[in-house]
Regions:
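Repeated scaffold domains used in trafficking and secretory/extracellular systems
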Residues: 49-59, 99-108, 150-161, 205-213, ...
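Conserved beta-propeller blade signature
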Residues: 66-70, 113-116, 167-171, 219-222, ...
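Blade-level signature of beta-propeller repeat domains, shared across WD40, Kelch, NHL, RCC1
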Residues: 704-734
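Short, conserved, GDST-rich strand-edge loop motifs in beta-rich repeat architectures
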Residues: 270-281, 514-525, 574-591
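Residue-level signature of beta-propeller blades and closely related beta-rich strand-turn architectures
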Residues: 73, 120, 174, 225, ...
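A short loop-to-beta-strand structural motif that recurs across blades of beta-propeller domains
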Residues: 77-79, 122-124, 179-182, 229-231, ...
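Surface-exposed loop and turn segments in beta-propeller and other repeat-based domains
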Residues: 44, 92-98, 137-151, 193-205, ...
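Secretory targeting and sorting signals
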Residues: 1-32
Length: 734
């Protein structure tokens, strides 16, 4: 009888010890994982070809006419071009490192200084006579009176014009609507003054003002992305009138990119991408007071400008100018509205060079530039000649590209990395890492023009997703990486409604799942299945995708797929919140979704809302054991595919945030590596702690530079980018 009693006591002690151990495991703080690696910056990569969307002109203090050519990118590259001798006078960085410079349009002040409206949200004033390093001043600065009151409206600047009083008008884009900002450089004893010309925005519900034109006290603004309008504003009273523009003028356009006004004519660019003749041949001529189409001999006036901007010329009261291919020869054309005729002013311009609103420096000197290759065309009207800048032994005309922020990054079999940049370019960056970081090798490889939003690859294919053309460009995969010689392309949709192929995930050796989004922030995205072997694509817009359960119909509408993972003939897709993706309401109806798509039946089989208060499911990945992981930027979680439920979950309430943009997540040897809130974080797959930040964002005077574009190299190290630099996180040996 005594033995059983002893056994009972031992059993009770064991139970007590087990209970204590369990309690400690629950209450004791988990130790954050530390991979023990180190971060290394790879050498500075070569820049891509120059991005020159526009050019400016002015004269030096000695009267020399010059072109102001800025290559966009990280800090930008400022070139001063002598238009008389057709030579490059100087070249220097425009702005400090980590300044996003996108030179969309220029205008000239009466003091010969040039203004640059940058897509990075800055208005620069450039003095070409100033010493090196002192030529550019950023006027979009809190030290300028009124700027802090308008800063929220100036996230992106599209256009700039100047009136006869040197007052500056800037077209902007922002989440708070499209605005026109006015800057008066002479106010406040030369410190300037910023104001919002039309408080509340120019057009309700539209996020951008894309184009401006000014003449004789009236400002004209092309606004909208879904509903396009032209607004006429009296700059003395700020009274605004919407013009009655014929519907066919704006039909099919995503923006009103080009306006010009001269001598009682309002020129409106209408070019729609494609090979068909655009409305009015590219430019419609309207009455600037009413919006009615101008007529000549009973017929509408039309200019065959195709995609060219119509520009004015000093000393010409009525004529306007544009460039166009004539008999396969690039020409500069002069249009006289009095006779409704055009004549060739010069031939032999660079084929890609396009005019800007201030291309004419004088009545004799004209300059235009190629947006994506830096080619230059300088015209001397007096002898009707056109020429580029002199080329060196390497074929360069001296217009040098700027470093640019890395947009996307991937590692391929064989060990190389491929990267793309922010803003379009006809090339990719190939990186060959080395254990000794200073022996890293780079090369620039030719690729179709575009901005690569996403990469995907299998053992047989390398796929790139191109913006703004909305197409996939595919290369065969060789033993040492992709063979770049013979790319093939396919449009995701025939109507170009899906333009950003963000996410490309292999299903098998030949097929890929592709998640795409439309041009604007609003609107539904699409899920596509791409067969690379056949170069065929099937696209399923989320607004009308098929559901296995009819009761789910509509649950994905007005959302965009940002993350995809493939698991056992199913795709698990994470979306944005509905509408603009910001989920201000934080409701079930607006929240982001996670859905399951059957690759065989091409139907959505299950849908869930993991978190009502988040903006998107930014990344999904599959672990080595088949577990599915995801993140929203704040939450990290697992997904149980069997019953389609959320398993483990952890909220990083202190260092995470609900993100609206796609990111990346990788599982390596039982550890999750995810970009969250602009940081690279290592987390245990148990999700028992907040993990460890192994690569943080960097604070600079120009703002934060975030970590992005995470990929796992063939060497099993992590690679990612901050700005224009690629970094490696090297793990300890063994």
């Amino acid at each position: 009888m005594r033995q059983p009693a002893r056994t009972t006591i031992i059993t009770l002690w064991g139970a007590l010890i087990t209970a204590l151990a369990l309690a400690l495991s629950i209450t004791a703080p988990a130790v954050a994982i530390d991979p023990g690696g180190r971060e290394e910056a790879l050498p500075t990569p070569p820049p891509p070809k120059p991005s020159v969307p526009s050019v400016g002109t002015t004269a030096l203090s000695d009267g020399t006419p010059v072109g102001i050519v800025v290559a966009g990118g990280d800090g930008g590259m400022l070139h001063i071009v002598d238009l008389s001798t057709r030579t490059l006078r100087s070249r220097e960085r425009l702005a400090p490192e980590n300044t996003d410079v996108q030179p969309w349009e220029f205008a000239r002040l009466s003091n010969r200084h040039v203004l640059l409206a940058s897509g990075g949200g800055q208005l620069f004033e450039i003095d070409p006579d100033a010493p090196e390093g002192k030529k550019a001043t950023n006027l979009s600065d809190p030290s300028r009176p009124g700027y802090e009151q308008v800063a929220a409206y100036s996230k992106f600047l599209w256009d700039v014009v100047v009136d006869e009083h040197d007052r500056v008008y800037v077209a902007t884009q922002s989440d708070r609507g499209g605005h026109i900002l006015r800057y008066d450089p002479s106010a406040n004893q030369g410190r300037g003054q910023w104001t919002d010309l039309l408080p509340g925005g120019v057009q309700a519900g539209q996020t951008e003002v894309r184009s401006l034109a000014y003449d004789n006290g009236f400002l004209y603004a092309g606004t909208g992305t879904k509903t396009l309008s032209i607004v006429r504003i009296n700059t003395s009273t700020n009274a605004a009138t919407k013009l009655s523009v014929p519907s066919h003028v704006t039909a099919g356009l995503g923006h009103l990119e080009r306006l010009q006004v001269k001598a009682g004519n309002l020129y409106v660019g209408t070019n729609v991408p494609g090979n068909v003749r655009p409305t009015c041949g590219g430019t419609c001529v309207l009455d600037p007071a009413t919006g009615a189409q101008k007529m000549k001999d009973g017929k509408p006036i039309e200019l065959d400008t195709w995609s060219s901007q119509v520009v004015t010329r000093p000393g010409e009261a009525e004529k306007v100018y544009y460039t166009v291919q004539s008999a396969n020869t690039p020409t500069l054309q002069e249009y006289d509205p009095r006779t409704n005729t055009s004549r060739t002013l010069a031939e032999g311009l660079a084929s890609t060079a396009r005019p800007s609103q201030s291309s004419w420096a004088t009545h004799d000197h004209f300059i235009s530039a190629g947006k994506d290759d830096g080619s230059i065309a300088i015209v001397h009207a007096s002898d009707r000649s056109a020429a580029d800048l002199p080329k060196d032994a390497n074929g360069s005309n001296g217009i040098r590209g700027s470093l640019r922020s890395i947009q996307s990054l991937t590692a391929v079999p064989g060990g190389d990395l491929y990267a793309s940049w922010y803003m379009t370019t006809p090339m990719l960056l190939r990186t060959t890492p080395n254990a000794q970081v200073d022996k890293t090798q780079y090369s620039l490889t030719t690729a179709p023009l575009g901005q690569v939003e996403g990469f995907g690859h299998s053992s047989k294919w390398f796929v790139t997703g191109i913006y703004p053309s909305g197409e996939l460009v595919t290369y065969e995969m060789g033993a040492n990486g992709p063979r770049m010689e013979h790319p093939r392309s396919v449009k995701i949709t025939t109507d170009a409604s899906q333009v950003r192929p963000y996410t490309i995930v292999p299903i098998d050796a030949d097929r890929f799942a592709v998640g795409t989004t439309p041009m604007g922030k609003n609107g539904s995205g699409a899920l596509s299945i791409y067969d690379a072997a056949r170069n065929e694509i099937s696209t399923y817009p989320l607004d009308d995708i098929a559901y296995a359960d009819p009761s789910l119909r509509g649950s994905l509408s007005n959302r965009r797929p940002l993350s995809i993972v493939h698991h056992k003939d199913k795709l698990y897709v994470g979306t944005s919140a509905s509408g603009d993706g910001m989920n201000a309401a934080q409701t079930e109806a607006a929240a982001p979704r996670l859905f399951e798509f059957d690759v065989k039946t091409k139907q959505v089989t299950r849908v869930m809302t993991p978190f009502k208060d988040q903006r998107s499911i930014t990344a999904l990945t599959s672990g080595s054991d088949g577990t599915l992981y995801g993140t929203t930027g704040m939450h990290v979680f697992t997904v149980n595919p069997t019953d389609f439920t959320i398993g483990r979950s952890r909220a990083l309430t202190r260092q995470g945030y609900a993100d609206a943009n796609r990111s990346q997540m990788i599982e390596r040897d039982g550890v999750l590596y995810a970009i969250m809130a602009g940081r690279l974080r290592a987390l245990s797959t148990s999700l028992q702690d907040d993990g460890t930040v192994i690569a943080d964002f960097v604070n600079t005077p120009q703002g934060k530079v975030y970590v992005n574009s995470l990929t796992l190299g063939a060497d099993r190290n992590l690679y990612y980018a901050r700005g224009a630099t690629i970094y490696r996180y090297t793990f300890p040996a063994g």
